[in-house]
Amino acid sequence: MVRVRLAPSPTGTLHIGTARTAVFNWLYAKSQNGDFLLRIEDTDKERSKPEFTQNILEGLQWLGIDWAEDPVIQSERVAQHRDAIRALLEKGLAYRCYANESELATMRDAQKASNQPPRYDNRHRNLTKEQETAYQAEGRDAVIRFRIDDDADIHWNDLVRGTMRWRGGDLGGDMVVARRAPADQIGDPLYNLVVVVDDAAMEITHVIRGEDHIANTAKQLLLYEALGLPSPTFAHAPLILNADGKKLSKRDGVTSINEFRSMGYTAEAIANYMTLLGWSVPEGMEERFTLREAADQFSFDRVNKAGARFDWDKLNWLNAQVLHSWSSAQLLDVLRPLWLKNGWTIPNDNGWALELCELLGPSLTLLNDGLDQAAPFFECPDLEDDGLKQLQSEGAKAAISHLIDALQAERWMGTDFDQAQTLLGDAAKAAGVKKGVMMKSLRAALLGRLQGPDLLTTWSLLAKNSDDLPRLQRCLS
C-alpha cells in the first residue's frame, strides 16, 4: 500500500509551500487508495512551539486534508535516532569529529580564497585513538559525521524529474548527523538522519516534497543503504515562485495560510489553486475542481519540472467562482460571523439576511468583500465624491424631495416592486427630470455612491428596516 507523509516543522504557521506539499501528497495517496500520514518535526527545541503545531493541524483540516493515523511526534523518537547513529559508529560508517568552529572557519576561508566550493575536508575521518584521546584531554566536544566517499555514485528514478544522479564528492564532505557533545555521548541527531529513521519506521513508500530537497535525497539514500533500510520512491515538485521568478518568500508578502484566510479566501479555492501550482489538468478537465475530483485524475506525469509562478489573478478568479457557486444560505453561514464581529445587528428573521446574500453574492471575489459591500445595509454611509456630485446636480434634490413626499403619503414596505417603479416615475415627473436622474440620485442617497448592486433590491432591503427614508431626508439637510 502507498504511504506518504507530510513532515512540517512547527516553527511558524502553516506556509503556502507546506500546504502545496500537503496537497500533492494527499492527492497521490487518494489516487492510489493509500494513506496520508503526518509527522511533526519538532526537534528544533528553541523555535518549535505547540501553538504552531496546532495551527498547522487546523490549517490542513481547513483545506480538507485528513490523515490516516495519529501524527508522529519526532521529538518522542530521539532514542531511536541515537540507536541508528550508534549502529553507524559500530559499523565504522560514522566517526567523531573534534574540529572546533575556529578551525572550520579557517578551513572555509582558505577554500574561499582559492575559489573552491565550501566543504568539510574530512580531516578527522581517520583519527587514531591517541589523537582522539588528545582532543578529549583538551576538553573538546565532538560532532558525529557520516562518511561520504567522493566517488560514491548516487542515483534514483524521480517521479517528476526522471533519472537523477549525484556524486558523493558533490555533497560537501562527510555529513554531520549529530550535534556537538562530550565524546562519551551522542548529541542531538540532525535532520537527514532522523528523517531516514522515521520514514522507515512509518513504512513510507513515497516521499513527495519540493525540489529544494534534492541534495538531501542524495544524502539520505546513502543513509538508507548504510542502515540497511528500504528506501522510498522520491518525487520532487517544483518550487513556488514570485512574479520575478524567484522562490516565494516572506519578503513577497502573504505566504501563510492564516493570511489567506484572513483576506477572505475560501478553503476550496486555496486547495484548488495549490493543486494547479505545478500540476497541469488533463484535457477536458476544468481548472476549477475539488480535491476529491483532482485525486481521481492526479499523476506525476502531469507535474511540471519548472517552477510554478504564483498568479494572484488566477487565485482571485477561482475564489470568485467558488463564492458564486454557493447558495445564499451557504454564504450567510460564513458572512454572519463576520457581520456580527463587526458589531452589526442582523434581523432575527433569516429572510432579510438571505436576500442580502443573494444580492451581494454574484459580485464577491473575496469573503471580505461581503463586509465592504454589506456595510451600507447596516450603517449609513458617508457620501463619496461621485454620490455628492450627483446629489448636487440639477434636479436631483427636487427629485429626492418629491420621492420623500410620496413615501410619507404612501409608505413603501420593500415588497411591491411595481409600486416602487410608480413612485420613482411620479417623483421624476413631478421634479421635471428624466427617470435616469431619479435612479442615480436614489442610489447616491441610499449608498453614498453611484456604483452598487441592483437598485430596487437595495432599496427594498433598506426599506424593510425603515432605513431608506432617513437617508433620503439626509440629502436635503
Curated annotation (Swiss-Prot):
This is Glutamate--tRNA ligase. It comes from Synechococcus sp. (strain CC9902). CDD domains: GluRS_core (cd00808). One of its GO terms (cellular component) is cytosol. The keyword Ribonucleoprotein does not apply. HAMAP family: Glu_tRNA_synth_type1. Coiled coil: none annotated. The keyword Ligase applies. Catalyzes the attachment of glutamate to tRNA(Glu) in a two-step reaction: glutamate is first activated by ATP to form Glu-AMP and then transferred to the acceptor end of tRNA(Glu). One of its GO terms (molecular function) is ATP binding.
